[in-house]
């Protein structure tokens, strides 16, 4: 049946090409789109594929949304609107982006997804061929299509995330000749020099270094279960997330995970409007054009309403119920992130689809309820994770040197940091609040309230964080008490979720965000909207979910030496100064799980006033103040005594002074 629909679609597309002039002023669009879909159908039909052919397809496919060609691409809402008017222009840009998912379906051999994609386009094109087109009619068609196929789409997506039997990418990793960089074109993702050069570089490293990198990563994941007293014996699978080009490390990680009884689940980040999120989750590659992706962040605005949200949640629940056995044995994600991309400063376009206020509220509600569904089947207290990060060649000419330095940072002596960080914790446990103050142009002036402890001889507010789930080593952190947490957090420049924020300033009142601004755009309205969309995720406020002090001065020296401070991921940057997370605490949904520090004390600061009432936000974004922008951090006791921890960016608390030794290298 599917194959018949596929053949009929190809015939209909050829007919559309013949009759395209009947779509009148829209003929250029429909002609281009028909060519695009005929191209992916031809790729699907080509069963014997050489690497050279895959390479050629890849370059042709991604070329037309490249930065060089995007100005005149139908994927550009600005261009489409200029050519066809706002109502049709936005719809056409949306449809173009949705049809581009067809390349992945063709490469993977996913005929069902390819067929329904074709049918959506053909149904819309028929409106124009018959002269019955109207923006509202098109939106109805899109809504009905998304609703009708949500069950199938979400069932497959959840299966992708839980079933090792879906092994498209696993086979590429485990069976390909990794000495040939062209094997990367098998994925169907955009392949740039970053991916090619990363693989070439890793192929030059001795096998023992590759094994050591994989072991650091796998051991971190395994230790997460041990440290948090989670029984790993029922677990049978792990999700490996990475950037294409790291296959030698991933292959070794698969082998090491198998030794502890875990099979790999490797899936790509979502490619359709139903499966894409604001963040890419899965295996990824460099973006052919970050502005294109930014322009299409809220494409769901064209059909997302309360009816659809409820239906989507029902489909989500049904999919998890179908794969509940696979969910039960899922151990969690092991994430290998990358950094070093050229900074992306997005352009705000009036023509982009945007969520209405009502849709924003529904989106927040969906994220909350979808998270609750997932947590029913993959219980937070029964899973773990790990996350590690490496540079990519785009970071500059010193890539190989920086890579080796990052490997060193990722494998620093945990025992040394355990002892030093304990001195910080002992001082912080005496505090009722901690005062953090910036210097120079940094306007930070914050008082963070601490939870009361019943028995300080057996309890602690701060976790001694070593290199297990969160690599590299180097922080102590707590869940602040919201009441009494007040002041301003300011950073001159910071990268959060691949976006650059300039002069980010957030005011907290009783632990909740009360005001915010930045200087990314000309108008205050644009700046506030940028923060609300990309930091608050369309909420009106978020709590301060974490306060931490990073101790990894070695990483800081590396950043300064190679001038990459503002290219490093938050995973490393958070270890290089005090940081504050907005959103949930680090113990979200796991507050009742007993966690102890190496000294045996139980960590008791796990709830805050929001989570105590069952209120969660499904986000956690860390914001760090670099040492150089820091005047002081001071623990203030109940009696008003001040215990100085850091002064002028240097550690001054007794027992922590050795952390300053790396800083002498940069003066």
Label each region the model flagged.
Residues 429, 497-500, 540, 573:
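Short solvent-exposed loop/turn micro-motifs enriched in small/polar/acidic residues
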Residues 479-538:
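Long, well-ordered mid-to-C-terminal structural blocks that present hydrophobic/aromatic surfaces
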Residues 484-486, 501-503, 510-513, 542-546, ...:
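Active-site lining segments that contact anionic ligands and/or coordinate catalytic metals
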Residues 1-483, 647, 651-667:
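Active-site bordering "gate/hinge" segments
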Residues 245, 341-343, 392, 441, ...:
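Short, glycine-/Ser/Thr-/acidic-enriched flexible segments
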Residues 241, 388, 437-439, 451, ...:
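Generic beta-strand/beta-sheet core signal
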Residues 599-667:
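Extended hydrophobic packing segments that form well-structured cores
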């Amino acid at each position: 049946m599917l194959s018949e629909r596929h053949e009929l679609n190809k015939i209909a597309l050829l007919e559309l090409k013949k009759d395209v002039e009947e779509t009148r002023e829209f003929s250029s669009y429909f002609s281009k789109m028909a060519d695009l879909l005929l191209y992916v159908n031809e790729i699907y039909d080509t069963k014997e594929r050489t690497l050279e052919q895959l390479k050629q397809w890849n370059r042709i496919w991604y070329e037309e949304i490249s930065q060089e060609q995007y100005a005149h691409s139908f994927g550009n809402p600005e261009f489409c609107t200029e050519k066809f008017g706002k109502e049709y222009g936005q719809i056409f840009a949306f449809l173009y982006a949705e049809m581009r998912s067809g390349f992945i379906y063709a490469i993977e051999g996913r005929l069902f997804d390819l067929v329904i994609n074709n049918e959506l386009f053909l149904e819309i094109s028929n409106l124009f061929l018959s002269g019955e087109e109207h923006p509202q009619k098109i939106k109805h068609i899109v809504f009905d299509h998304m609703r009708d196929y949500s069950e199938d789409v979400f069932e497959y997506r959840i299966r992708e995330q839980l079933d090792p039997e879906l092994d498209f990418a696993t086979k590429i990793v485990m069976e390909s000749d990794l000495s040939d960089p062209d094997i990367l074109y098998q994925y169907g993702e955009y392949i740039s020099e970053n991916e090619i050069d990363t693989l070439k570089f890793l192929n030059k490293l001795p096998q023992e270094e590759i094994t050591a990198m994989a072991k650091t990563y796998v051991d971190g994941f395994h230790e997460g279960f041990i440290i948090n007293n989670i029984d790993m014996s029922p677990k049978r699978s792990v999700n490996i997330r990475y950037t294409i080009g790291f296959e030698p490390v991933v292959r070794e990680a698969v082998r090491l995970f198998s030794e502890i009884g875990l099979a790999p689940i490797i899936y790509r980040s979502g490619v359709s409007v139903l499966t894409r999120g604001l963040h890419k989750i899965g295996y990824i590659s460099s973006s052919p054009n970050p502005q294109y992706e930014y322009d299409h962040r809220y494409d769901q605005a064209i059909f997302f309403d309360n009816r659809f949200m409820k239906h989507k949640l029902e489909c989500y629940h049904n999919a998890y119920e179908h794969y509940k056995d696979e969910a039960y044995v899922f151990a969690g994600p092991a994430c290998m992130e990358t950094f070093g991309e050229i900074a992306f400063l997005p352009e705000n376009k009036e023509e982009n689809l945007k969520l209405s206020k009502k849709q924003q509220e529904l989106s927040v509600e969906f994220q909350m309820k979808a998270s609750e569904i997932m947590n029913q089947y993959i219980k937070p207290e029964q899973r773990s994770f790990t996350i590690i990060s490496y540079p990519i060649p785009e970071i500059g000419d010193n890539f190989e040197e920086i890579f080796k330095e990052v490997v060193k940072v990722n494998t620093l002596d945990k025992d040394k940091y355990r002892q030093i960080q304990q001195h910080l914790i002992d001082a912080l446990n005496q505090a009722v609040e901690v005062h953090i103050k910036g210097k120079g142009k940094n306007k930070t002036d914050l008082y963070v309230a601490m939870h009361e402890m019943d028995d300080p001889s057996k309890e602690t507010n701060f976790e001694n964080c070593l290199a297990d789930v969160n690599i590299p080593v180097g922080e102590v952190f707590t869940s602040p008490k919201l009441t009494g947490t007040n002041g301003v957090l300011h950073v001159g420049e910071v990268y959060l979720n691949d976006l650059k924020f300039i002069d980010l300033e957030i005011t907290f009142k009783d632990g909740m965000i009360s005001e915010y601004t930045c200087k990314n755009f000309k108008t205050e309205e644009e700046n506030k909207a940028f923060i609300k969309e990309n930091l608050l995720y369309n909420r009106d406020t978020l709590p301060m979910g974490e306060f931490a002090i990073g101790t990894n001065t070695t990483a800081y020296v590396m950043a300064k030496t190679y001038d990459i401070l503002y290219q490093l991921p938050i995973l490393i940057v958070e270890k290089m100064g005090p940081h504050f997370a907005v959103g949930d605490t680090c113990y979200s949904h796991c507050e009742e799980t007993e966690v102890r520090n190496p000294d045996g004390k139980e960590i008791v600061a796990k709830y805050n006033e929001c989570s105590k009432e069952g209120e969660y936000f499904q986000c956690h974004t860390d914001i760090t103040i670099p040492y150089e922008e820091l005047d002081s951090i001071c623990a203030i006791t109940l009696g008003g005594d001040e215990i100085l921890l850091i002064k002028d960016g240097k550690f001054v608390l007794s027992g922590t002074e050795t952390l300053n030794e790396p800083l002498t290298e940069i003066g």
